[in-house]
Regions:
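Active-site-lining helix/loop region of Rossmann-like oxidoreductase modules
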Residues: 3-134
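C-terminal active-site/capping subdomain that shapes the small-molecule cofactor and substrate pocket
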Residues: 98-203
């Protein structure tokens, strides 16, 4: 999830200076490994057959047709380990030890690819048009952003593909010098160690 988020933020950070991040991630069950995939499949099958004897070994609640705001262990302060990992890893990769970050990580009944809703505030003013230009030459990310024609990233668009997709780019209505955006990527492909190294090399 961190890598997918960073892919959406780094092109903008390099030009406008990242100041703070508010994010909500919608994480596929493949983030829990094969066991998560099987649990979702088993629950969907059971419910389609009218059975209520759902297996719940991986997640504390039914994941089929549900969302669970609980990814990894809860820590002191009410944040999960995954949420704190996003904060700490994001600061480390971007080399911004004082970056203000808050996030909520949610497990969703999608097999593959994580999605992240991000509000990012910058040191310098930035327009939607300037953001699009910043993404143009950045490797590994592609803009899909024409909401009027129902064009925006979805998990299915990125499954088993290397590129992350960004869309719903708009100026935030609350924070100054801020953009809201939607980033989606196959965490298995983009979240691999190789891609983490590639991102570090681009900073």
């Amino acid at each position: 999830t961190t890598i997918v988020t960073i892919m959406g933020l780094n092109p903008l950070h390099r030009k406008f200076g990242l100041k703070s991040v508010i994010a909500s991630s919608y994480q596929a069950v493949s983030g829990s490994g094969q066991a998560g995939i099987m649990e979702l499949s088993d629950q969907i099958r059971a419910l389609s057959e009218g059975r209520n004897d759902l297996t719940k070994n991986v997640y504390p609640h039914q994941i089929a047709f549900n969302v669970i705001p609980h990814v990894d262990q809860f820590m002191d302060g009410g944040y999960t380990r995954e949420e704190l990992k996003m904060l700490n890893e994001g600061r480390k990769i971007l080399e911004l030890p004082d970056l203000q970050v808050t996030c909520t990580c949610v497990r969703v009944p999608v097999y593959r690819s994580h999605s992240v809703s991000v509000t990012a505030q910058f040191e310098s003013p930035v327009s939607v048009e300037e953001a699009r230009v910043a993404y143009e030459d950045y490797p590994g990310i592609r803009v899909v952003d024409d909401p009027g024609n129902a064009l925006y990233p979805t998990p299915l668009d990125t499954t088993e593909k290397d590129d992350c997709l960004v869309g719903r780019i708009r100026e935030d209505m609350v924070l100054e010098n801020a953009l809201a955006l939607w980033v989606v990527g196959d965490q298995i492909r983009k979240g691999a160690a190789l891609n983490a190294v590639q991102i570090a090399e681009l900073l």
